[in-house]
Amino acid sequence: LTHNETSTGVMMSLVRPAGSGDALVVVDATSAAGGLLWDPAEVDVYYFAPQKSFASDGGIWFAACSSRAIERIEKISASKRWTPASLDLKIALDNSKANQTYNTPALATLIMLESQVGWMNEIGGLSACNARSQQSSSILYSWAQARSWATPFVADAEKRSQVVGTIDIAASADGGVDANDICAALRANGVVDTDSYRKLGRNQLRVGMFPAVDPEDVQALTACIDVVVEALRG
C-alpha cells in the first residue's frame, strides 16, 4: 500500500484488508511518515526515507516492523534462499538490533533528522504534526475552492493529501493562466518548489505541507498566487 502518493497528492487510510490471512501488509510511507496518523495494528511494515516530513535527506531507509514481519524475515533467511545484500532485510534487522547500519550513512542526514525529530516531539509528537499538516491543507484546499480558476485535483475530499496538495489551474481560455507562468513568477520572487509532477500532464501547482512548513506560510503562499494570477490575467 502507499499511504500518501507524492506526485498526485492522494492519501489513503491504512486498514488491513479483509481476508488477508497471514499475508503481510507492507506500506510505502516516504511522504506520509511523520505527517499522517496511522495505526500500527493495521500494518506489518511501515517504511520510509526521511526527506519529506522529517526534513532531512534521502539515502537512508527506515522501517517499523511488526513481530509477524520480523518472523517472516527470519524465516526467509533461515531458508538459505539467495538474496542480494541490497535486498536482504535480515542484514538490516541484525544491524538495527546492534544500533548499526550496514552501510555508512551521511552524517548530515542524521544530524538534520535528529534535529527534526526533536522538534516534532517538542510540539507534541505525531498527533501535533498531523494537526499542523491538516491545518495547512485546509487552508490550501479552502482557498482553491473559493477561486473560479483553481480546483483541488483530488475530487474526493477524504483522499486529498494533508502533506502534498495538488491544485488544478484553469486554462487561459477558461479564465485561468498557465501554471508554469505562475511558478516562474513565484520563483523569480524567491518562492520555489510549486511545480507539478510533469508526467501527470496537467496545468497544476503542487504544494508541500509537511509539518516543518508553517501554516501561516501556506496562507501567505495563497495570497502570493492570487497576486500573480491577477497580474498574469491582466
What are the functions of these language-model segments?
Residues L1-T30, V45:
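Active-site phosphate-binding strand-loop segment of PLP-dependent enzymes
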Residues V26, P40-Q51:
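Conserved active-site segment immediately N-terminal to the catalytic lysine
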Residues Q51-S142:
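Active-site C-terminal subdomain of aminotransferase-like
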Residues W149-V154, V191-S196:
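A short linear hydrophobic-aromatic micro-motif
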Residues T151-A185:
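Conserved PLP-binding catalytic core of the aspartate aminotransferase-like
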Residues A157-V164, R198-R206:
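Small/polar glycine-rich anion-binding or flexible loop at a beta-alpha turn
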Residues D178-N189, L221-D226:
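Short amphipathic alpha-helices in soluble, non-transmembrane regions
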Residues K199-G234:
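PLP-dependent enzyme catalytic core of the Aspartate aminotransferase-like
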